[in-house]
Regions:
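Segments of small-molecule ligand-sensing domains
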Residues: 78-91, 102-163
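Hydrophobic alpha-helical
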Residues: 3-24, 100
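A general structural motif
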Residues: 1-2, 29
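Short, glycine-/Ser/Thr-/acidic-enriched flexible segments
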Residues: 11-12, 39, 154-157
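Extracellular/periplasmic periplasmic-binding protein-like sensory domains
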Residues: 17-95, 106, 153, 174-180
């Protein structure tokens, strides 16, 4: 209970888990954690061996959770309408990046990267976008964020992604919807 595996990857997780299952069907009895690069991987549920390994290990995957608001809903509905599918969480972030940059250009009143860089943190801090409030740390990264937690669940002979909870940064806690196995 004091050892776990953090696997940060993208679609190569399918091949890695398929190979791992050759040596241990239960992941050596330790908890496995993924990243936003593995969350909602279509390959992980399409390939039965990798899906079974994910399911058996309780492979938990976090992904940025935008604040749901009227702005969030507007972007969600527009993307759904145009693409025929719901946007992923980083769609809201990309939308906000464009707006913060545009507003920073207007605030700086110059097309000078130094002038834009000087005003961007303040512009971001005062902007509530489709992803929520944007407060940056000293490195220019988002200072805080919540994360949705997903696992792979088994349905008869197939697998699907299942939302199980949310990490809430403000309280440094997890609110479980359905606790993982």
């Amino acid at each position: 209970d004091k050892v776990g595996v953090l696997y940060i990857a993208f679609e190569e997780v399918v091949e890695f888990f398929t190979e791992c299952s050759v040596y241990s069907s239960d992941g050596w009895g330790v908890k496995w954690y993924g990243s936003d690069g593995t969350t909602m991987s279509a390959g992980l549920i399409a390939y039965t061996t990798a899906a079974a390994f994910s399911y058996t290990t309780g492979f938990i995957n976090p992904i940025f959770s935008p604040t749901q608001s009227d702005k969030w809903q507007k972007v969600h509905d527009e993307v759904q309408n145009v693409l025929g599918r719901a946007p992923d969480s980083y769609t809201y972030v990309a939308y906000d990046i464009v707006w913060v940059l545009a507003l920073s250009l207007l605030e700086a009143d110059a097309h000078d990267s130094g002038a834009v860089r000087a005003v961007l943190p303040t512009v971001a801090q005062n902007y509530f976008g489709a992803s929520g409030w944007i407060v940056l740390d000293e490195n220019g990264d988002r200072a805080s964020a919540d994360y949705d937690l997903w696992i792979i669940d088994k349905l008869d002979t197939t697998y699907e992604w299942k939302y199980v909870g949310k990490y809430v940064q403000a309280t440094d806690s997890i609110i479980w919807g359905t606790p993982p196995p």
